[in-house]
Amino acid sequence: VYTQTPRRQVNLSAFYLKPGQEWMTTLFLRRMMADDSVDYLDVTPSYSMREINRRIGFQDHSTGMVVVPTAAACWRPAGTCRLLALRDVPAGALSPAVMSLLARHHRLGCVALVVEMEGEYHPLILAATGRKGVAGVRVLLARDRALIRAVLGPLSRHLLGRGLFYLEYDAMAAPDDIPEALFWRRSSPVQMTRAPVGEAIDLTFSEFAFIPSPKLAVALKDLPQRAKHRVLRWSATDRISAYADPVTGVALQLAEYGIV
């Protein structure tokens, strides 16, 4: 979306390295990646594949995952940002190609929204994910991480109302301006053979959109109703307590509901 010149990209999500066969991998990948006009991407490399990728030209574009509890971030003000559903986007605000991209990801089960900020419109795509049975979303497409931070309040409220308890996105370091966020260094780094333009996150049509976890589907089945009847009906005192100590408050609520 954010590249000046459209390029072909090959995702190595289906590449499997059999233990004990590492010596063959480098030669195989070098032959497979002989076309310099193609960008190569690996968003879920195993520990052994990460080092092999680096040797053949991949660069790390993240060192961990920023994880933001939506129950803690939902108190943030909207500022000048506004979230729009696809049906509410004004005609001509985004190109037909971008609107088609959003619609196709929406049909795949992703959260597809448009952010209106200072008179400009930006696509935002999130894919369902899960950690230890807790449902959340991962950012697949955003102009940059600054846009995510700017819209974090209304976005967290939107997600929490749908039973999604955290938002995560890949990054090189923990953000200084999101104190409620955790930085998970054990997540796989995003590796690419070509540096992305600017600070954009673009993992559209990756395995996160096509292959959701089977366990996650079961966990998500009744979460919206549980969130509607429990999380969104906290008393004022409960809400203040959770805000004062977000991590503890959210953890206690999740434990109470039997989610963790």
Task: Enumerate the language-model features and the residues they cover.
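Amide-forming acyltransferase catalytic core, primarily the GNAT-like/NAT-type
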Residues: 54-140
